[in-house]
């Protein structure tokens, strides 16, 4: 029987592994909504009722696929993620929160929301409520929609690619060191294939 890492590498080499490799939660593309993760954990008996699940990607409200769930489902991939999430704050200092349907979750400390008059919820960039909201979850919704915060109108006749690069730059030495340490930890502590999520 192949290890998870060997299974993925075998498939990437266009050879047939012992079974099809499975990625669930290794990246935002393969994530699962936190309410579904909660229901799955309950169905598998992994948690007592009411145990919250961490929201690891708050824009889509993706839930953590923790090691016990990875093992229960035979997941072969683990994510190497940035220190900050889509909204620009770290996934740390967890605090309780509830979805519209009542599902208990844990969100990062800077997950700062504000209710709107229509029952929707506003989210703020980097958790900074002094800034204009950057996303909105509709009343009864499951995830956030980005808000247009454009300051000046688009001049379609004079587009310049540099105008779209202000939020992108080289990865800092600190961030590279974080990725190096985290990749090493995941390699040593798991037998999973490591999927790097550098953002961008």
Which residues make up each language-model segment?
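Catalytic cores of TIM-barrel enzymes
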Residues: 1-200
């Amino acid at each position: 029987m192949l290890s998870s890492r060997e299974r993925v590498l075998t498939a990437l080499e266009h050879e047939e592994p012992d079974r099809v490799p499975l990625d669930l939660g290794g990246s935002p593309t393969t994530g699962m909504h936190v309410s579904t993760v909660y229901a799955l954990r309950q169905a598998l008996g992994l948690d007592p009722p009411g145990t919250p699940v961490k929201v690891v990607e708050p824009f889509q409200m993706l839930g953590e696929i923790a090691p016990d769930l990875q093992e229960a489902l035979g997941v072969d991939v683990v994510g190497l993620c940035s220190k900050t999430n889509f909204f620009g704050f770290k996934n740390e200092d967890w605090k309780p929160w509830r979805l519209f349907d009542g599902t208990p979750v844990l969100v990062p400390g800077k997950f700062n929301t504000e209710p709107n008059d229509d029952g929707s919820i506003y989210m703020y960039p980097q958790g900074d409520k002094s800034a204009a909201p950057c996303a909105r979850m509709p009343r009864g919704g499951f995830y956030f929609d980005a808000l247009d915060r454009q300051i000046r109108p688009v001049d379609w006749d004079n587009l310049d690619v540099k105008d779209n690069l202000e939020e992108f730059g080289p990865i800092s030495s600190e961030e590279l060191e974080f990725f190096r340490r985290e990749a090493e930890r995941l390699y040593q502590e798991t037998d999973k294939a490591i999927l790097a999520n550098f953002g961008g």
